[in-house]
Each structure stands twice: as structure tokens, then as C-alpha cells.
Amino acid sequence: MRSIRFAPLFPLMMLCLAGLTACGGAEEGPTNHLGAAPAEVFYSYPYDGQRRVSPASPVVLRFSHPLTGGADGVRLSEADGNSVALAAPEPVDGGLGLLVRPAQGDLRPGTRYRLTLDGLETEAGPLAFPDGPLTFETRLASGGANGQRGFDTVLRLREVLPDGEDLPFMDFSTLRLRFNQMLDTDTLTYGESISLTRDGELVPAIMLAKGDAVTLDPRQDLRPGERYTLTLGPSIRGFQGAALAGGGLQRSWVARDSRPRTVMVQETPPASGRGDDPCADPDGRRSRLTGQAMNCVPIEAVLLGDGDATQQSGNVFTELAFLPHYPDVSPLRIPRGSLLTGSNVKVKVAGAVPAGIETGDIAVTFLSDASGYLLPNPFSRRPEAPRQVRLFMDVAMTAENPEANGALSQTLLQVELVGVAKVEGPRLVIDALGVVEPEVLGQETAFGLLSLHTESYPDQNNAPAPIPDTRAPFLQSTMPMAEDGLAATVQPGDALVMNFSEPLDPESLEQALSLTREGADEPFDWSLDGASVVVRPHQPLRPGDSYTLAVSDRATDLAEPANPVQPASRTFRLPALIGDPVAPVLITTYPGFPCAVDKASWHIAEGDHGRCRGGRADDDHLPVPALPADRPIRVTVSQDIDPASVRLGDTCGSGSFRVERVAVDGDGNPVASPDGDKRKYQCDAAVPGRLKVEARTLTFIPDQPWEDGAAYRYTLQSVNRASGQQPDDCVSGEAICSQAGKRLQTALLEGPEPDWGGPDLEIHFRGAPVTDSVFQALNNLPTADVNANGFFDDGEPGYG
């Protein structure tokens, strides 16, 4: 943590926050007393104009007077007027607040909403928003169709926080950029494609990037009165390769002076002192805003259930700009490296079945300076109305238990807290709400609503001081985990992962990581997610070769002064390939089944996909599967794929990987036409989308969600039997091939020769609604038949 100087300005700060005229922030004229004033809204989450709101977020309101009648007066609609059904409102704090959730699941991502009040009554009259409907916008989807991951096909910068107008650009500001679509973060390099400069000189800064967001945190305070320029270069790309509109842009601001600053120490009191599951204590302290356990983060996920929560605790050291200079919009900062500690969680599958894993303490580390502002109340001008608080922070979640840390460790970028601040006696009390959406095992986005409550210590001169971080970070675990040097649980295209005990400084890692193959340097890219370093070799891991992954003590944590990492290395090798190469086969196809079917046996309109070629006449027929609207097509292959052989078709009948809409009749059923003794179906149009080619996996993501009930098919091309094979099959789009040049085998029941290809694999499916279930893709580990030839060869693991 940066060194913090305590200034004797806290009493003056408290007077300013209380709204006294000495700070220039109070209004003249008689004071309205609450009992005589009309009823007003004091707080809303989301606030008016808020962006990147989680689709799972509730609406939270707080009022000047408690409700006296029914609470069914909140109306929510999309910007085009479509109403959103709401569940029964939940009164909070004796009717001084409401919590309202959608009745039918989450809101739509990337959508603008309007919130109105109609019929909410208090003893002081009806409640309404003073400036008409409140509007907010949900965040983009992190998964699903490509069209849900962006507002536009052209890449644009939507906003920069602070903007220098409504939110002043300070000498301690951290810049947070938000774009109109997900980014290709590999195109972001600080000092090249993106930079912050003063008089043409690059400002040393930490860059964090994830999804549609980028954070630039200067390593040292900026110089007040100096102009700083943000430059975005033409090489920045969106996730589908879209270039930045206009070929780049520049914006500049003059840094304003925050000095002399005041340090306010706030405690984060526990909801309960109960040692086991404190957030579930029925007698625990509750948030004024939500009625839920204060300072607890309940994690709601299908994989984990909704009954677990972690309780946050710790001291927060907040630096405030000199408030007499900023009486209306008052900037503040929480330094990079600050830490909150969460309580232990006992992991349960689906919230019911114990997984035998406990997280230990969960650490929330600030990866950059958190930037915040105390703002005038947007709904009320009377002095008793609390001030609004907005805080933007980038944090890492890590777990004390290495087993849990490998699954939990991740970065949460640009988390926004929105709350109220009010002076209560000698304390400044803040209640705020924020949403965290951590990934669970990389399979599901969980939802957690943080009901934050902090209180300043009444005697700031004797408040706790920051505890210096003197612990050296260390390597907790790696993937792969090698036994006797043999890494039997990974495949050639897998990434390498190093999980550390705490988050590391990304700049320090640049010269600290190394990867060698057979003693020679192996090129790689790397990324940092929480306390996990993900290493991706440029070439897939080569079976049989020895690799060494190492980190040196050049890597450090985020403390000031920084603590170097304990050096560590791991050596491993994949099982060697034995014997001659054979044709690759399909391990899984989603949706559908990994076999070419007898087209004389299928009746797609009736939901009958026929039986596998080479099978018996009395074999079961396969069903026509359904694919939920937000899921991709995913295919896994037994051997490394030759990327040059995979071509996505953009018209009917083109490409070696085809995704097509099927021609249908007036009832929406696919139309069959005779083809000798078989039936064939016609393409209506190619489905536009993006095909991701990995070492052994093909994933197709459509531009738009699959339509409910619509008929689709996807086809993997190959060439049947040796007689039909041509030398250019693997480069002409005729067949999907392995790196060894063997064509895809799709009909194993026909007993083909080991090096033969197979017939085209055509799988029909119907679009279906989004489901709440979680799709878990499982890999077949090469524990025995490493070369995937269907035999246990002498020399393979366990058989040599």
C-alpha cells in the first residue's frame, strides 16, 4: 500500500460533509424539517443514467418517509415500451425502502430500461422521481451470441471515467475506459496501442483490461495543473476484429489539485460475530438499503446454489481531496493494494452436496486505486437528504486454500458501488450497493449483491494505522500437476496456469516468466487473472518433450514497497505418441451425436435423426436435439486439428465447417427431397457467426441467438474412403484434417481402415429458449490411448 500521511483536517471535513456554510456547500434560506416536507425519493440503485448494470440486479429504492399503503407501485419497462413483470416488492427498514426483482429471471443484456413510480404513498404524500422516469442500461453479455456482446459492429469508446466535467479529473485519478463491445485484449499494449502522456512523455501506469473495460492507473500522482493526454491507436480491435472508429482518438484533461488531503479511516463492521456462516445469522446486522446481511456477498449460482455468502471485514483508508475546494462533488481515493478479508465458505455442489472443499479466508485486493466521489443527492435538495456515493474499483478475489484458489482466483474489473453517506454523530456512515459477478469454474457467471456498510472511526487521531504487507507471494499450485514429471491430465492445446497466494504486479511479470522446451526458450503469451498467471505457448504442447515453466523473483506483489515472489519452477512432459498416425475421430459434438447417420433412416421433421451408419437395423434412432438460444456449437476431436483445413462457410454449401438454416414448409418443418434411397434437406441460408479453432476444439458462436423452434444444421466435411481422397483435401475446404494430414473419420461403426476419412457429418437441430442449466464441457483425458488409434500400444502410459 502507498504510504499515507494523516492530516489534522478531519473535523473540518466532517463539518463540510454535514453541509455547513463554511464549506460553501449549504443552501441559504430556511431549513425544511422532514415532518413538514413532501415525501421524496432519497436513493435508487441503479441510479439515473447508470450503465453496465448486471441483468440480475434488483431495483433498490429508499425514501424520506415510510410507505403507508401497498408497495406495488414500481413500473419497469424497456426503452421501446415493453413492460417487465416484477415480483412482489420487498419492503425494507420499516417501509423506508423497497427491493424489487424481475418476476421472470434476469433482464436482457445490453438493453435500456425505464423505471417509474406510480401509486407509492406515504403520510407525506405520493412518491415520484422529480425529473421523470429513471433510466439505466444493462451490461453487455459476456457469453452467448456475438450480437449480444456489443452495441455496434464498429468499435467505439463510450465513456471515460472521470470525464473531467461532472466528475473532476484529479491528480490522483485512475482512468477507466468503457467501450461499446467486448475487446480483443491482445491488441492492447500500454505505451503502444494505448497511452497516457504528459508533454509527450509516457506516464508510468498499470493497465488492466477485461471484457469491454480498460483501466489505467498511474503509478505516481499526477502533477496538478498539467495537461495529460489519452491516446488510443488504430491497432486496437474489438473481439471480432472491428477497428476503432476514426482510426484512433485522443482526449486530454488538466489534473486538478487535491491537496491538502485528509485520510479517513473507516471500519467495515461484521454482520455477525458468529464463527460459522456469519452471514446467515438471523440476529445479525442488516443493511438499511436491502435488508440483507451487511458487508456480506451472497454468491448465487446454479453450480453453487444461493445459500453461501462471504462476510467482508477490514479497515479502509480513504484519501479525500480538500473538501472546501470541492464542496459539491468531492473526490476520494482508496489506494492500490488495499485489502478486505472475507470469511470462509464451505463449497457445496448446487448448494446442497458438500464438495469437501473450504475456501479459507477470501481476500479482495484492490488492483488499482479505487476512485470515488461524494455527490449531491440527485433527488432532493433539502439538507437532511444523504449525499450520494459512487466508487469505482478493480479487485482480485483469491482464496486462502490452494484447492479453492485455483477455481476462484480472478479479476473483477470496474465494479461500481452506489450508496449514500451521512454524518451520524462523530461518524461518517456509508451504505452502498454493488454487484460482483465472478466466474464459477469457468462455466457460469455467478451473481453477488454486496450490501456495504462502513463507519469512520470517531477519533481519527487514534484510528488504526495501515498494516504493512511484508509477506512474499508464493506459488500455490500449477496446472498441469505432474507426477514423476508426467503430465497425463493435459492435452497439447491446453494453457499452463500458475496460481499464486496473492495478486502480482502485471508489469513485474514481463521479465519474470520463462518457458523452455527441451532446454530451449519456447515463445508464449501470458495473462493475469486475479492471482492466476495463464501461459499460452504459441505452439501446442508437443507430446514427449520436456517443458519447464518458471517464475523469478523479478515478479512482485502490489505492496509498497513491493515484495518479490519466491522463485519457483515446474518441469513436466506430456506422454509421447507411439506408432503411426491414424485418422482423427470426433469425441463429442454439441448438439447431437458424433456419428454420420444413415440418411435413409432419418425423418428430421418428425424429430427422428436416424441411426449411425454401420449400425444394425434395430439400433435406436437418434433424436433431433435442441440448442438453447445462448449456447454455441462445440465439437472436440481426438487429435490436433490442422487450422488450415477448417474453413467456415459463408454461403450455402461452402466451407469445411458449415452452419446453415434449413429450408422449411409453411409449418416450419424441414422439407425432405428424395436422393436415391435417401432423404436430403436444402439449405436456406448460411448462419453468420464466428468460428474459434483451438488445438482440439471447434466452437461456433452465431451473430444472433438461435431462434426458438427454427431448423438448423451444421456439417463437418470429410472425404469417404481412400479412393476418394485427393492431395489437396486438407487445404481446399473439402475436409477437416489433423496436423498429421489425416481426414476426419465420422463412421467408426463401418469398420474403416485406420487412415481413411469418412462421410460428411451433418447434424440437424432446433433452436430453443435460454435455459437456467449450466453447460459443462468435459474433456477425455489421454490416460491410456494417447495417440487415439483405438489400441493400447506398447509404450503408452500403463501399458509399456
Language model region names:
Residues 104-111, 220-226, 539-545, 704-710:
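Surface-exposed, short loops/turns at beta-strand junctions within beta-sandwich domains
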Residues 19-22:
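C-terminal motif of bacterial Sec signal peptides marking the signal peptidase cleavage site
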Residues 258-479, 595, 774-791, 795-800:
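Extracytosolic secretory-pathway proteins
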Residues 94-101, 210-216, 430, 529-535, ...:
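Aromatic sugar-binding surface patches on proteins
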Residues 24-78, 109-114, 118, 125-194, ...:
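N-terminal non-catalytic regions of secreted/periplasmic and cell-surface proteins
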Residues 1-11:
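Bacterial N-terminal signal peptides that target proteins for export
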Residues 120-127, 236-243, 555-562, 722-748, ...:
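Short, solvent-exposed loop/turn segments at the edges of extracellular beta-sandwich modules
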Residues 63, 111-120, 179, 226-232, ...:
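Short beta-strand segments enriched for Tyr within beta-sheet-rich domains
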